[in-house]
Amino acid sequence: MQIYPLRLLPNKIDFDFMNFKKVSYSFSIILSLISFIWIGIYKFNFGIDFAGGIVIEVRLDQAPDLPKMRGVLGELGIGEVVLQNFGSERDLSIRFGSSSEENLMKNIELIKASLQSNFPYKFEYRKVDFVGPQVGRQLIEAGAMAMLFSFLAIMVYIWVRFEWYFGLGILIALVHDVILALGFMSMTKLDFNLSTIAAVLTIIGYSVNDSVVIYDRIRENLRKYHKKNITEIINLSINETLSRTILTVITTLLANLALILFGGEAIRSFSVLVFFGIIAGTYSSIFISAPILTMFANRKFNKKVIER
């Protein structure tokens, strides 16, 4: 039985990506500067994880309808409200952002009254705690360290598998993707919480995977076409992997779209940011990480790159 691969593009496609190198560099620099300026002016919409807040622990007489409950509490106008089960399905944790002292008790009573009037459950309020912003600062530091270590691990991996200048190309693309993702988060006022840190790490992984696929094809074509220059090799490699890249990004975006539409508020920031990051990562793997290799066109590519 013969298997026919799924293709969205013809087998022989010869689009000159490298002809847009300067345009793509300029475009990326402008977007990065806009992101920096926007973040500097408007900052981030820090969620409860980082800004601190109130935690109310409740036990109900039956399993609650969490999506409906999130919708009701989200309409109170007191900011982000996070509901989660802990322990059994009847135990509920309600978290919302810290307020001024005079509004603190008012918001707690507002939540209690809203739950009592909209749901037929019996509520047993077990504990009310205040989580200070100091914990948030520790989480921000931990998230920053996680991203730093991921950058370093990726650099070492690419250096071992290819050569240091390949790692430089990926590092520049990753910094570009993270800056755009943070700028997008600031512009859209997505909650900056632990799930968005996970989203940024997911974007990093996706972008690296895309770039490594192209780099592998570049290395393979360096073995096959000794007379072609590096610009021709990169163009050929991007075109040969383009169908795979488009198929992968479409299927991933469709899966992520389902999370955005049906995942609820609990993972909205994560899914929206990953959706944007997949697009940014695909763009950077084609127009940034691969074209950067032309900076080394005047030096002979290390034989280790071709032989590995």
Swiss-Prot record:
This is Protein translocase subunit SecF. The keyword Cell cycle does not apply. It is found in: Cell inner membrane. It comes from Rickettsia felis (strain ATCC VR-1525 / URRWXCal2). The lineage of its organism: Bacteria, Pseudomonadati, Pseudomonadota, Alphaproteobacteria, Rickettsiales. It is a multi-pass membrane protein. Coiled coil: none annotated. Disulfide bonds: none annotated. Keywords: Cell inner membrane, Cell membrane, Membrane, Protein transport, Translocation, Transmembrane, Transmembrane helix, Transport. GO terms for cellular component: plasma membrane. Part of the Sec protein translocase complex. Interacts with the SecYEG preprotein conducting channel. SecDF uses the proton motive force (PMF) to complete protein translocation after the ATP-dependent function of SecA.
